[in-house]
Structure formats: structure tokens, C-alpha cells
From Swiss-Prot:
Site (Part of a proton relay during catalysis): T46, Y110
Keywords: Amino-acid biosynthesis, Cytoplasm, Diaminopimelate biosynthesis, Lyase, Lysine biosynthesis, Schiff base
Catalytic reaction list: L-aspartate 4-semialdehyde + pyruvate = (2S,4S)-4-hydroxy-2,3,4,5-tetrahydrodipicolinate + H2O + H(+)
SMART domains: DHDPS
CDD domains: DHDPS (cd00950)
Keyword Amino-acid biosynthesis: yes
Protein name per its UniProtKB record: 4-hydroxy-tetrahydrodipicolinate synthase
EC number, as in UniProt: 4.3.3.7
Record pathway: Amino-acid biosynthesis; L-lysine biosynthesis via DAP pathway; (S)-tetrahydrodipicolinate from L-aspartate: step 3/4
Keyword Cytoplasm set for record: yes
Homology family: Belongs to the DapA family.
Amino acid sequence: MKKAIFGAMTALITPFKNGKLDEAGYEKLIKRQIKNGIDAIVPVGTTGESATLTHDEHRICIEIAVETCKNTKVKVLAGAGSNATHEAVDLAEFAEAHGADGILSVAPYYNKPTQEGLYLHYKNIANSVKIPVLLYNVPGRTGCDILPETVIRLFNDCENIYGVKEASGSIDRCVDLLAHEPKLYVLSGEDAINYPILSNGGKGVISVTSNLLPDQTAALTHYALDNEFLKAKEINDRLYNINKIMFCESNPIPIKAAMFIAGLIDTLEYRLPLCNPSVDNLKKIEETMKSYDIKGF
């Protein structure tokens, strides 16, 4: 049986203060996730603004995540993707050497590899480490789609590739993957379809909303994994509006604004080209948040 990291996972935001990484603030956010029942955290992914972090900042985030989760049940699935295979390998090796439990590796963006190129890319990454590797398919951002046959080929050929974070927005894709390979771990990468994916055999979620509502995301996921689908759906229905507003602008713009409004980060800062949400959207985010019980530190 393959070693896997699954369940309720949070795609962590990266807080900044005066343009620099807010290390103390980052640690506080992680401790709050641990306290509220999350199974794993995902530092330096899309939501963590990995594209605009320096390599040093990327590594510091992983180190803080590993150190903060030490001696807890919470796993660290470190973001370690790149559109250059050698760089993705370097990041994967760093994550493993510094104690990450696994890595999340986004499909190479911009250079649009073929399916064979994707296979070779991921096979090189998997061969470079022993920890679990989760593929990350998000064609809307990368311009590159890891097709089901490539996912299954990698799952069968690489011992430590255990599944895929599916953020294509297609429930059919997830059903198709599981129909062809029931042992594959399919994780939802879009909060709006967490419940449909979980109720069709998905093994967890990598959530943006759980930055704000980790307890609710954990409860939804755990109910679904325990086959208590009515309870899971009740929570999913309650989360509908907040999940929707979190994508009123490009992620992670809305979730960072929400975290600031909730007092969970000290300053609302992004790295350009990301910038503050519009005044109208900021008001909508704030209004939507009033319907939810947001736990503090």
C-alpha cells in the first residue's frame, strides 16, 4: 500500500509585513490550523503566493511549517513545483531533507509540455525523493492538463506518487480517474466542489477557505470520509457563500483580505502583480463573513 497524505488540508496563505515574510505571523497561522483539526497543511502553494517568493523565503516557509507541526499529528505537504524539472527536483529534495512529510508538485506552467514530457518530469521528481508525491493539476493556471492516462501511468510506475490534487473544476474528471484506478488518491482542489468529489470517492481536500474556517472544513471532510454524507452536506451547504466569495477575484486575493478582516494577519499585503481587492469586493467579502463563526487564535 502506498504511503499517502490525505484528509482535510489547508493551502496556507503567506503573510507579509512591510514587504517581508512575517515569520511569527506564519507560525501563528499554522498553530491555529493544528488547534482546529486540520490533517495537513500545504505551505508555499498557489495560495501561498509561491510564484513571487524568493527561493530563500520558500525554504524558510517549509522550515517553519515542519518545525511548528513537529510532535503533532498534522502533516506537512510542501509545495515544490516548477516549470523547470531540475528546479522542481531541487525543491523536492530540500523539502525531504528538512522534514516535510510529502510534496505537492504543480504541473509545469507556461512551457506547455506534452503528456510524455509531463510523465518524464514527474518521474524525475519521484525518483529524487522517497517521500510521497502528490500531482497538482490546475490547467486554468498552468495552461497544461495532466490527462487521466498520464496520472494513472505515473501512479502505476512510481511507488511514491500516490494521487492528484484535481483543480480542473471537473467532477467528471475525478469520477473518471477513480473508475480507472480506485486506489488512486484524488483530492479536491476547489472548495466549490469539495463535497461532490468527496461523495464520489475523493480522499480529501486542499482548501483555501480552511485558512479562515479550518474547523468547518475538517468536519465536512471527516464526515464524508466516514460515509456520513448527510452531515457533510449540511456543512457544505453552509459554506457555499463563503466558498463562492473567496473566488470573486484571483486566489489568494480574497482569502487574504478575509484573514485581515478577521484579525488573523496584521497587514493586508500582497506581492505584485497581485494587489488589494476592489472596494466593492472587499465589502462583499466582509458582509459574507458576518454569517460565519470564525475562530481566533
